[in-house]
């Protein structure tokens, strides 16, 4: 099935679902078992999580908050043992409240990028002091071209890596997989913006061949990424492996029929690279790039297979015990919009990681989500958009319980820390979020 149109339609549907919290939807829902969370702590945030994912290391949680009612953001450090702020960095007011890259850590420093300006901010991990602001281009225009695509950067501890947006238009500029060595940064000049120009590890001749819509990942000394090529004249995207020591391409595969447009579509487990696209699911040998297993979505009706296509804005994929868990494009409107049977529509699925075959799924009650479930001791926990906190038997998919007092935007990444499932609970009226930890 060609779902590039479907993804857009369902995205609009999900937004409209979110606006109808009091529309009587609950009266249409079947009676479901209830779940009563055992809270370890709850922290009311100063604002809400911004459009970027948090970073965790040890017992600490690093988050960029959007301060409600302002155009201001701040980086914060939270103790996951106690649920209290450790520090709050100085606020940033640069005219863009929503978008930041994810937070990464190298040595004892934290980094994130503001894509609106092409600036990287660096902070001390121990106290949150600003150490540097770096413009990733010789000019502001070049920095904008070099900014990260889809707000994602990664690090191997010595450098920062990201896929750039390039530039559309009558004379389009191709995107690049960029590298910025952090030893080129002067950490004593925090009061002024310094210029550090990254260099390219990978590009193509035209923007149609090299645009980035998915997050790269690092495994050891190797970086993996795929390009976005929906408009590629030959209809394929490229899956690439780069050796970070030699900065050379280890292998590159042309994947015909794939678009490479899912935000966080890659995960590596046991030497296998999994790629989830809007048209196909792949299982790949990470050393050679050989496609070991491929599942292609149905292109035309009548549809007979379960809906297993991931949502475009996927936060990530959870792996547990030879299974992959993730959210799809499915919502309550999917059946009427596509002609699919409601029995085939799922907003959360569990598939066999070796065969890529469907094992179980959750039929959506209202809006879908782009987050992922966390699996602990045979149970899968997920905070959905409007459908509440839901707990499933991770093996069978049986719904064990629901707490509908917990709601979220559905696009937040969850965290498993020891025996704590940590998630965001949002008050839609105030747009304030509470970071919660429950014992699981």
Residues covered by each model-derived region:
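Short loop/turn segments that connect beta-strands within beta-propeller blades
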Residues: 79-82, 124-127, 181-185, 243-247, ...
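Short glycine/acidic-enriched loop and turn motifs that connect beta-strands
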Residues: 67-71, 116-119, 166-171, 229-234, ...
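Blade-level signature of beta-propeller repeat domains, shared across WD40, Kelch, NHL, RCC1
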Residues: 399, 403-440
């Amino acid at each position: 099935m060609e779902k590039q149109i479907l993804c857009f339609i369902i995205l609009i549907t999900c937004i409209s679902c979110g606006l109808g919290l009091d529309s009587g939807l609950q009266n249409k829902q079947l009676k479901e078992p209830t779940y009563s969370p055992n809270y370890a702590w709850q922290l009311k945030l100063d604002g809400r999580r911004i459009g970027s994912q948090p970073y965790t290391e040890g017992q600490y949680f690093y988050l960029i908050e959007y301060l409600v009612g302002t155009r201001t953001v701040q980086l914060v450090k939270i103790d996951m043992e106690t649920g209290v702020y450790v520090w709050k960095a100085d606020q940033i007011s640069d005219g863009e409240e929503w978008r930041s890259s994810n937070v990464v850590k190298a040595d004892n420093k934290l980094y994130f990028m503001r894509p609106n300006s092409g600036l990287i901010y660096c902070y001390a991990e121990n106290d949150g002091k600003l150490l540097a602001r770096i413009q990733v281009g010789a000019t502001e225009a070049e920095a904008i071209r070099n900014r990260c695509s889809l707000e994602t950067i990664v690090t191997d501890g010595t450098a920062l890596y990201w896929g750039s947006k390039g530039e559309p238009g009558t004379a389009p500029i191709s995107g690049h997989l960029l590298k910025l060595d952090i030893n080129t940064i002067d950490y004593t000049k925090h009061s002024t913006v310094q210029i550090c120009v990254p260099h390219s590890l990978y590009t193509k001749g035209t923007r149609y061949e090299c645009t980035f819509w998915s997050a790269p990942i690092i495994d050891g000394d190797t970086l993996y990424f795929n390009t976005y090529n929906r408009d590629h004249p030959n209809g394929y995207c490229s899956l690439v492996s780069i050796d970070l020591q030699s900065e050379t391409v280890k292998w590159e595969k042309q994947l015909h029929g794939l678009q490479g447009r899912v935000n966080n579509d890659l995960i590596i487990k046991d030497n296998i690279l999994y790629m989830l696209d809007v048209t196909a699911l792949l299982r790949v040998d990470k050393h050679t790039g050989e496609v070991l297993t491929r599942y292609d979505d149905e292109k035309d009706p009548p549809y007979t297979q379960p809906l297993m296509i991931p949502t475009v804005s996927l936060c990530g994929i959870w792996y547990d015990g030879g299974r992959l868990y993730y959210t799809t494009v499915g919502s309550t409107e999917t059946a009427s919009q596509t002609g699919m049977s409601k029995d085939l529509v799922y907003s959360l699925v569990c598939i066999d990681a070796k065969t890529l075959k469907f094992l179980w799924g959750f039929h959506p009650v209202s809006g879908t989500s782009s987050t992922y479930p966390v699996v602990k001791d045979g149970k899968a926990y997920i905070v959905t958009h409007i459908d509440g906190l839901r707990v499933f038997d991770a093996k069978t998919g049986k719904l064990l319980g629901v707490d509908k007092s917990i709601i979220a935007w559905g696009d937040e990444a969850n965290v498993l820390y020891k025996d704590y499932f940590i998630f965001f609970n949002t008050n839609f009226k105030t747009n304030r979020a509470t970071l919660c930890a429950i014992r699981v």
